[in-house]
């Protein structure tokens, strides 16, 4: 699955444990992961952690990121404030696939309290390996840029 060499992972306090599992999973797949999230479960402000990933992607230091919070909603709002970011809150394989194929998403957002842990790695794999289809989808993306 070596679609991306670098994946950025960030989280707030609610996503710390899931982020740790995700990083281990990605590293086992020989992906380089930069962790710019919290390192414990003490309360932090999610916009600060979303901004870290957004800034790194905008600077082109990494092509793709993963953000994790309790539901993912706040992270989605915070990350999508930039026109260069297409952050997608995904709950299953279909949303992960469409996020990439139709929307060229560059940040996957997961809700630690809402995601089915049995399929979280499948969702990540689908997100990382699906290619943007372009065509009519590109026309639509240009309208919201």
Swiss-Prot record:
Keywords: Isomerase. Its EC number is 5.3.1.-. Pfam families: LacAB_rpiB. Gene3D superfamilies: Sugar-phosphate isomerase, RpiB/LacA/LacB. The keyword Metal-binding does not apply. GO terms for molecular function: intramolecular oxidoreductase activity, interconverting aldoses and ketoses. The active site is at residue 102. Belongs to the LacAB/RpiB family. This is Putative sugar phosphate isomerase RF_0486. It comes from Rickettsia felis (strain ATCC VR-1525 / URRWXCal2) (Rickettsia azadi).
């Amino acid at each position: 699955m070596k679609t991306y060499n670098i994946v950025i992972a960030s989280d707030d306090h609610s996503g710390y444990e899931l982020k740790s599992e995700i990083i281990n999973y990605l590293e086992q797949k020989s992906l380089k992961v930069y962790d710019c999230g919290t390192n414990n479960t003490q309360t932090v402000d999610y916009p600060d952690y979303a901004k870290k990933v957004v800034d790194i992607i905008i600077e082109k230091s990494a092509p793709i990121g993963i953000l994790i919070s309790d539901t993912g909603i706040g992270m989605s709002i915070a990350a999508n404030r930039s026109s260069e970011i297409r952050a997608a809150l995904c709950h299953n394989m279909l949303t992960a696939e469409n996020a990439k194929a139709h929307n060229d998403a560059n940040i996957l957002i997961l809700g630690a309290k809402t995601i089915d842990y049995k399929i979280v790695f499948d969702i990540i794999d689908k997100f990382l390996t699906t290619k943007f289809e372009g065509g009519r989808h590109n026309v639509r993306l240009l309208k919201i840029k």
